[in-house]
Amino acid sequence: MGEKGESVAVIGAGLVGCLAALAFAKKGYEVSLFDYRSDPRLATTTDRNLRSINLAISARGIEGLKAVDDELAARVLRDMLPMHGRMIHNLAGKQEPQEYGLFGESVNSIDRGVLNNALLDEVSAQEHIQAQFGHKLVKANFNHGATQQLLFAVEGKTVQLEFDFVVGCDGAYSTTRQQMQRFDRMDFSQEYMDCFYLELYIPPTPEFSERFGGPFAISPQHLHIWPRHNFMLIALPNKDGSFTSTFFGPWSLLDRLDTREQLAAFLTTNFADAMELIGLDNAIRAFQENTKGALMCVECRPYHLPGGKAILLGDAAHAMVPFYGQGMNCGFEDVRVLMGLLDDYAGDRTAAFAKYTASRHRDLVSIIQLAKNNYRDMSHNVVSSWHRAKRSLNNVLGRTFRGTWLPLYTMVSFRADIPYHKAVEVDRRQAAILSLVQSALLSLAALGGFKGLLLLYRWIKQVRRV
């Protein structure tokens, strides 16, 4: 538990910042939550720079919420829609489902703004959290005796405040992180991916669809992908029957899409069925008028300052591209892991923060790399016959040797008890086995039935011990 009167400043009232504020308040700390933006729940608030890809919340994110409060998790997730797999749309418009889980597991689509506002409502209901919007962190002094001195810009003036410690949840361009670098030797790197994203919109249908159980034009139980090798379109369902659709492609592609005619030809050639849903004119207007977002990764280490003065969570510590759907899930897991360490060390921030950096780094590096790698999987491998056959075999082994063989996606998305780095290690070992299995299948099949299956099982166990 926090010491009586101990204060924490949480910088950033996004998803991770809100959950961190709720978690610290539950442990007895006096929490101040700051954000440079206006309160997004206000009707007058319009953020033209806010461009978000719909969220896919899975086991790690859900467990992060539950670790703070089971009932809170149920309340803030009431608007999510389960997606049981991908729906692949080929050039001809044919749709092919690909299940996510081995046994019917699903990831869940939820609107970022809806979830953020739900968490802010929870924050507002807490006696020990004070949320202050329109406060932009300008400077921090982490050598100010027993407290940390923060300078905020507020309505053209500066305000100086002091806290026992600081939690930076202010995103990829974190000011908290920049200020921490002034006081410790923090390694830092950022990498822009040669890929932009652009949001599009599939409206709900005018009439209720009996087939889909609502005003949905396409299945709401799938994440839809139009993979076209070096570019792609995706769509995630919303509760109102609409879909948030996002186009991803290399920046150089824009050079070939200058005119309306070029855009029309490109979109109708590559996404004919999607244009029937979005509307060709709407898609062209979006390409011509909407801001294109950049995708970047951030890595740093350590994530904390000595003495328990400050720590980074979420994108401030590990921004990643969205192709594994783990950005928010990983950030919520950050909160759960940190709270567990504070329990383990009886509230000793110095020890808990140091252990967090030491134990969490491998996981964060692993998921950042997995997210980058998964772009090719979504845009290309999902239509590759070789990779589909390999994936099918992987899933067969997973179902046959339940609990012994786990596909990578299962470990990352549905097994919050398996750290990211451990999932990568297991996957590498299984990939080597899978390569041998593919070579051996014909000879094993000749043995037939149960005998072949038993031999395969014994052989896998033997290889896994190597």
Curated annotation (Swiss-Prot):
Keywords: FAD, Flavoprotein, Membrane, Mitochondrion, Mitochondrion outer membrane, Monooxygenase, NADP, Oxidoreductase, Pyridine nucleotide biosynthesis. Belongs to the aromatic-ring hydroxylase family. KMO subfamily. Pfam families: FAD_binding_3. It is found in: Mitochondrion outer membrane. HAMAP family: Kynurenine_monooxygenase. Its EC number is 1.14.13.9. Catalyzes the hydroxylation of L-kynurenine (L-Kyn) to form 3-hydroxy-L-kynurenine (L-3OHKyn). Required for synthesis of quinolinic acid. GO terms for molecular function: FAD binding; kynurenine 3-monooxygenase activity; NAD(P)H oxidase H2O2-forming activity. It catalyses: L-kynurenine + NADPH + O2 + H(+) = 3-hydroxy-L-kynurenine + NADP(+) + H2O. Its cofactor is FAD. The keyword Mitochondrion applies. It comes from Eremothecium gossypii (strain ATCC 10895 / CBS 109.51 / FGSC 9923 / NRRL Y-1056). This is Kynurenine 3-monooxygenase. InterPro entries: FAD-bd (IPR002938), FAD/NAD-bd_sf (IPR036188), Kynurenine_monooxygenase (IPR027545). Pathway: Cofactor biosynthesis; NAD(+) biosynthesis; quinolinate from L-kynurenine: step 1/3. GO terms for biological process: 'de novo' NAD biosynthetic process from L-tryptophan; anthranilate metabolic process; kynurenine metabolic process; L-tryptophan catabolic process; quinolinate biosynthetic process. The keyword NADP applies. One of its GO terms (cellular component) is peroxisome.
